[in-house]
Amino acid sequence: MDLICMYVFKGEESFGESIDVYGDYLIVKVGTEFLAVPKKSIKSVEDGRIVIGEFDEEEARELGRKWLEEKSKPVTLEELKSYGFGEEGE
């Protein structure tokens, strides 16, 4: 089941938007922050919306920061070449 690009609600309240799945976590953009919400806290998924229950928000913020750092690392030329980029001019 695809959980990306869906509105996330905590109970009846709008919470954020899902942008990635990171292991056992759903990455949710909440304002300017990224939270790693445990997938086990998902209560339902239907009609383009995800409803979540309670979870440790401080831990979710910390894991969200780690996710952002990992996703923001620069890519080396060798990594680009391993994916087939940069070989056109050679």
From Swiss-Prot:
It comes from the Archaea. InterPro entries: DUF5749 (IPR043961). This is Uncharacterized protein AF_2094. It comes from Archaeoglobus fulgidus (strain ATCC 49558 / DSM 4304 / JCM 9628 / NBRC 100126 / VC-16).
